[in-house]
Amino acid sequence: MPELNIAIDAMGGDNGPSIVIEALEKAVHRYPDVKFTVVGHEQQLTPLLDKFNLSSHPSINLVHAEQVIEMDDKPGQSLRSKPESSMRVALQSLTDGNCQAMVSGGNTGALMTNAYFTLKTLPGVLRPALMTALPNQTGGKSYLLDLGANASCDSETLFQFGVMGAVAAEYLSGVPAPKISLLNMGEEDIKGNDVVRNAAARLAQCEQLNYIGFIEGNHLFSGRADVVVCDGFVGNVALKSCEGLATFIIDQMRDTLNSHWLYRFFFRFLQKRTHKSWDRLKPDHYNGASLIGLRHVVIKSHGSASAGAFYSAIQQAVAEAHEQLPERIKHRVEAVLSEQL
């Protein structure tokens, strides 16, 4: 396998390039054999690279990009009016073969539009999907897709999401024969609309997939399924609801702990003994949604990500590039489609 080179859109996100460069400092030490192409405005990035002693680092190549896609830019407008944006230049490095993966914390709609235009989908893939990993009660991860790339989907698209998600679970988490479910309003076969029921029939008929039926939202974190499939509208609402609930619980715990010194004492006592469990639940560890179904690896970081969270997105990019995930998805989709002939 050729040496990995990861393109970093340093200008995307709400917190500016300083967060990206701070994350990059950690990444170059964690992955000494990986190269990083940092794309953005040279005058802004050079002082930051100097600050973190990365200016002359052999693993880093700085590429100037004159334009920046803002968080409020319309996707179509960004595609037409900003061909020299840091996001587009980073994506183009994949097409040119200079890099094997790209990470951006920029405008989600713009990233999806520019990635789709620049990279194209894999042969046979109808639509790309946004996918993320969720912690589950078994100690592993469950992969949820789509998270918003496609507000509505037909049954064949949902079927393909199941195929792609299974490849991700198999090669990124080492799960043999990943269990696939469709997110639905009930577990009975009669529940859901025609699109979901038809997708269920397609998944059940495919001998190469381990489809286990419908799953409800309250079992997303149970580990019952390794891959949970839904359209982008449902997936986005489900994910944002989970994030909102987590924030609410953390805020409530913080208010309670601050109300009395004794609560803080016992919390510190428990925290030392449950460190691994708490650490596994930190949202920063799960930052980085994969835009799968494209010809190259594209990772979307939260726009408001901390340096630690952006580092997790870089880790995701390295893992997918190392496993050559797009190529594996391509072969699996081809095999599944040939089975249907």
From Swiss-Prot:
Protein family (similarity comment): Belongs to the PlsX family.
EC supergroup of this enzyme: transferase
InterPro entries attached to this UniProt entry: FA_synthesis, Phospholipid_synth_PlsX-like
UniProt-listed Enzyme Commission number(s): 2.3.1.274
An example molecular function term from Gene Ontology annotations: phosphate:acyl-[acyl carrier protein] acyltransferase activity
Entry's Gene Ontology BP terms: fatty acid biosynthetic process; phospholipid biosynthetic process
Subcellular location: Cytoplasm
Gene3D superfamilies: Isopropylmalate Dehydrogenase
GO cellular component terms, A-Z: cytoplasm
Pfam families: FA_synthesis
Protein name: Phosphate acyltransferase
Catalyzed reaction equations: a fatty acyl-[ACP] + phosphate = an acyl phosphate + holo-[ACP]
Function: Catalyzes the reversible formation of acyl-phosphate (acyl-PO(4)) from acyl-[acyl-carrier-protein] (acyl-ACP). This enzyme utilizes acyl-ACP as fatty acyl donor, but not acyl-CoA.
Record note on quaternary structure: Homodimer. Probably interacts with PlsY.
Record key words, sorted: Cytoplasm, Lipid biosynthesis, Lipid metabolism, Phospholipid biosynthesis, Phospholipid metabolism, Transferase
Associated pathway: Lipid metabolism; phospholipid metabolism
